[in-house]
């Protein structure tokens, strides 16, 4: 297994032809060109791997995600643009279906909005509680 320092520099990226840059290039684009309509349709239906629109992924972000997964010994990683997006994705993955979440009563306002407004749309009930109040704990 490669050393940690080696993984930090090389994991998740293989230089590609024609130029074979040692450092991953930064792809500053929002959209990608397709060789034909059929390929584009297949990629948008998620039947063929590839990049369609940078909000859902691009080669630069893919290198970062692959490198992070390798460094953490994981099978994959998801990069988000904000902490709020990371919180939402994590909780929604855990709270699929009609679930109930007990949350700390003193959260960031944006998180409170997420939990009370957005999560209600997904059928997730949220109760806010002060964890220092032991009378709220029922076994």
Which residues does each PLM region occupy?
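N-terminal glycine-rich, Lys/His-bearing helix-loop that initiates the first secondary-structure elements
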Residues: 1-48
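Conserved N-terminal alpha-helix of the aminotransferase class I/II PLP-enzyme fold
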Residues: 31, 36-85, 110-117
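A glycine-rich helix N-cap at a beta->alpha junction
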Residues: 118, 122-129
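Conserved PLP-anchoring active-site segment centered on the Schiff-base-forming lysine
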Residues: 93-111, 130
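Conserved small/polar residues in nucleotide/adenosyl-binding loops
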Residues: 137-139
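Alpha-helix C-terminal capping segments
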Residues: 70-71, 89-97
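Short acidic loop-to-helix transition motifs that present clustered carboxylates
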Residues: 84-87, 130-135
